[in-house]
Regions:
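Conserved hydrophobic beta-strand signature of PAS-family and PAS-like sensory domains
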Residues: 88, 96-98, 200, 207-213
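A short beta-strand signature within small-molecule sensing/ligand-binding domains used
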Residues: 86, 123, 148-159, 242-244, ...
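Mid-length scaffold segments of soluble, non-membrane domains
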Residues: 87-90, 96-101, 106-107, 113
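Extracytoplasmic/periplasmic sensor domains and loops in membrane signaling proteins
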Residues: 62-75, 104-145, 182-187, 214-252
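Conserved beta-strands of PAS-like sensory domains
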Residues: 152-184, 256-263
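Short, ordered coil/turn segments that flank beta-strands lining enzyme active or ligand-binding pockets
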Residues: 93, 163, 205
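Surface-exposed, polar/charged faces of alpha-helical domains
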Residues: 31-32, 93, 216
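Juxtamembrane extracytoplasmic/periplasmic/luminal helical "stalk" adjacent to the first N-terminal
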Residues: 1-66, 70, 74-86, 155, ...
Length: 263
């Protein structure tokens, strides 16, 4: 009996160590998500600037300013990144939109006074940053192209294009990038451990299964309150950070599970 208890304690420690490895990985990914997004946006804005600079250098002595701008707009028209969500826009330092591949109606109009639901003026902010330090990050709220029911936070970057006194901007909804990071994290965790012996499952704050070997979508889909549901609810509604529970597997063997919150 003592030997059995020692075996149980050893397995509890092994399970805890495995989950803590996953826990640390998730926390590190979450902590670095914003920095990764900034790096991505900086790379893309530099790419757009390089394209425009190359066109300018090639045609500055051959074509008019208006003709060169049209070539720049054509070059950037279909450039997309971040799974098709990312694009570029161009404004004058006075706040006139020069180029917008999605909202063509903005082109040629003064958008300096456009503000979000919190009263922030993104174009004004972008211009101020470009004037002060040529490039930098800023944020504001806007609605998605296919969902205008709510405005979500966007992280943007601006870079000055000095030859024409323009600014180039691009941005990403933070929620979309966080979801991308979340999906990458789940894919990584899928490959950890033995799927038959020590499967890892992930549940979000709304009790949805993000990773599971069953067809369950939500904890509420479990018809009767078994030991798992009971333990999950107890941990969720407590100030504890983790919890063990034991149960009898379908194979009639004793199983140990370990739950840990990710804040």
């Amino acid at each position: 009996r003592v030997l059995f208890r020692s075996y149980i304690e050893l397995n509890k420690e092994l399970i805890k160590n495995n989950i803590n490895t996953v826990y640390n990985y998730i926390n590190n990914k979450n902590a670095s998500a914003n920095e990764l997004l900034k790096q991505k946006l900086k790379f893309e804005i530099n790419t757009a600037h390089d394209i425009m600079a190359s066109i300018y250098d090639k045609y500055k002595n051959q074509k008019t300013k208006e003709e060169i701008i049209e070539i720049m707009k054509t070059a950037l028209e279909n450039v997309r990144f971040n799974e098709g969500r990312g694009y570029f826009s161009i404004h004058t330092m006075e706040g006139v939109n020069v180029f917008h591949p999605i909202y063509k109606e903005f082109e040629g109009t003064l958008v300096l006074n456009r503000k979000d639901i919190y009263g922030d003026y993104p174009v004004r902010d972008a211009i101020a940053i470009a004037k002060a330090k040529t490039e930098g990050f800023f944020s504001w709220y806007y609605y998605k192209l296919k969902d205008k029911s709510k405005e979500l936070k966007k992280l943007g970057i601006v870079k000055e294009f000095e030859p024409y006194n323009f600014i180039i901007t691009t941005a990403e909804f933070e929620e979309d990038f966080e979801n991308k990071v979340k999906n990458e994290t789940i894919e990584y965790i899928k490959d950890i451990g033995d799927a038959e012996k020590d499967f890892i499952f992930i549940i979000d704050k709304d009790a949805n299964f993000l990773l599971t070997r069953t067809k369950l979508v939500n904890v509420s889909d479990i018809e009767k309150e078994n030991i798992f549901v009971k333990s999950y609810k107890e941990l969720k509604n407590s100030n504890d950070k983790d919890k063990y529970f034991q149960y009898e597997h379908i194979s009639k063997s004793e199983k140990i599970s370990y739950l840990r919150k990710v804040e």
